[in-house]
Structure formats: C-alpha cells, structure tokens
Amino acid sequence: MGRVSTEALPSGLLNWVAVWRRNFLAWKKVAPASLLGNLADPMIYIFGLGSGLGVMLGNVGGVSYSAFLAAGMVATSAMTASTFETIYATFARMRDHRTWEAMLYTKLTLGDIVLGEMAWAATKASLAGTAIGIVTATLAYSEWDSLIYVFPVIALTGLAFASLSMVVAALAPSYDYLVFYQSLVITPMLVLSGSVFPVEQLSPMLQRITHLLPLAHSIDLIRPAMLGHPVPDITLHLGALCLYIVLPFFVSIALLRRRLTQ
C-alpha cells in the first residue's frame, strides 16, 4: 500500500458536504422506493422470525424473542443500508458514471469525496435504522426515549460499514466481486453477531471471533438500551466502532488513489 499524500486527504472541514449534497439531491427522486427497500428485509425478519420462532422460543434473556430480534434488526438495517450504498451506488459513481473523475477537476480532493460518500452512506443507514427503531417502539418492543440514545450509535455503525465497504469498492474490479463481500462477509456477520440469536449459543471459538465484528459492537450498544438494560463496556464498543471508521478510511484513500491514477 502506497503512502497517503496530503493531496489525497480532506482539504477542509466541510468540503465533503458538497459530495453529500449531490448524492442527497439525486436520492430525493427515488426516496420513497429507497426507504421501502431498506425497510423490507428487517421487517421480514421481525414479523417472520419474530412471530414464528417467538412462539417456540418464548423469552430470550428475560424479554420476548420479538423484542430481542427487533433490537438486533436496528443495527442490522444500518449495516445493510450503508454497505449497499457504498459497494453498489458509490462503486457505480466511481467506475461507471465517472462522477468522481468530474469532482476531481474541482477543488475537491479524493479525501473530500470519500468522506462525503461515507457521510451519505451513514445518513442512509441512520434513516433505515431509525425507521426500524420507530417501528419497534410502536410495537412496544422498546421504549421511545431509547431512540435518542441509539441514534448516534446507528450513525457510527453506518460510518463504520461505509469505511469498510469503501476498501472493498477500491479493490473490486467488477460488480461480481462485490457480491462475494456481501455473501462471504456481511451475511455471516449478520448471523454471528447476535442479531437473531444470543452469541452465547455459539462455540467458544466463534464467540471470540464475534468480539472482533463491528456489527456485534453495534448490537451490544443498541440492544441493552432499547430493552431498558444497562449498557456494559460502552467505551470498548464505541472505541471499536471508531477504529473501524478511521483505519479503513485511510486504507481506502491509499487504494483509491492508486486505482484512479493507473
């Protein structure tokens, strides 16, 4: 990996807003369909698995399985919304539409563009996660005031997965390789991170792996708060999410700089 030059880093505190605004204006035209698409999978899990398995499993950790599952789906929806925005929409803007190339002819640096794309992906993640949170509160699976606490965590989750996905987008030569990331990383992470069943049901080896997954840290922050329980190890989980935001960001900058100059 090459050295990240200062020209590739963000050139100002707010230059990325131009990229965010451009994506927002384009998204407004398809906003209803986009929101419904982000809600579809989590709602299927909540009503499908929650209603079906909830009857058989009863309570999980002192709460109904539906409430347990719904809290996990808040984090999961943020992960999927951010990931899909970055590995597909951002990848298309970078490679097919050549939107990035046009932006680089302005005063924006590569860092400004990447930061703006990540912020936009986190915005979509926040919308998706908050929407699921509102549904869970409406169904009395969580308290309304818990949404105030979990919203920043949803945003951090969106940034973390946007940063990770940006590395994938920088490395992928075609859309086919993006599917590998979705199938081999995102889907297993959904299963292993405690979104649909407690991680205590996993083997000790898999539990150790779970502690390294960003989705697991997000769920460990969101679920207790939504269920009215104390949140243990807040600093650890927040630090892990911040690490997943910062390190992949600089890695993606270096990879994208090399890719775009070839």
From Swiss-Prot:
Protein name: Nodulation protein J
Primary location recorded for the protein, binned into one broad class: membrane
Pfam families xrefs: ABC2_membrane
Keywords: Cell inner membrane, Cell membrane, Membrane, Nodulation, Transmembrane, Transmembrane helix, Transport
GO cellular component term of the entry, any: ATP-binding cassette (ABC) transporter complex
Membrane topology reported for the UniProt record: Multi-pass membrane protein
Gene Ontology BP, a term: oligosaccharide transport
Location of the ABC transmembrane type-2 domain: 33-259
Family label: Belongs to the ABC-2 integral membrane protein family. Lipooligosaccharide exporter (TC 3.A.1.102) subfamily.
Disulphide bonds in the chain: none
Listed InterPro entries: ABC2_TM (IPR013525), ABC2_TM_bact-type (IPR047817), ABC_2_transport (IPR000412), ABC_transptNodJ (IPR005981), Nod_factor_ABC_transporter (IPR051784)
Organism (species): Neorhizobium galegae
Subunit-level organization: The complex is composed of two ATP-binding proteins (NodI) and two transmembrane proteins (NodJ).
Domain of life: Bacteria
Lineage, uppermost ranks: Bacteria, Pseudomonadati, Pseudomonadota, Alphaproteobacteria, Hyphomicrobiales
Protein task: Part of the ABC transporter complex NodIJ involved in the export of the nodulation factors (Nod factors), the bacterial signal molecules that induce symbiosis and subsequent nodulation induction. Nod factors are LCO (lipo-chitin oligosaccharide), a modified beta-1,4-linked N-acetylglucosamine oligosaccharide. This subunit encodes the transporter.
Gene Ontology molecular function terms on file: ABC-type transporter activity
TM helices/strands, residue ranges: 43-63, 67-87, 119-139, 148-168, 177-197, 236-256
Localisation per UniProt entry: Cell inner membrane
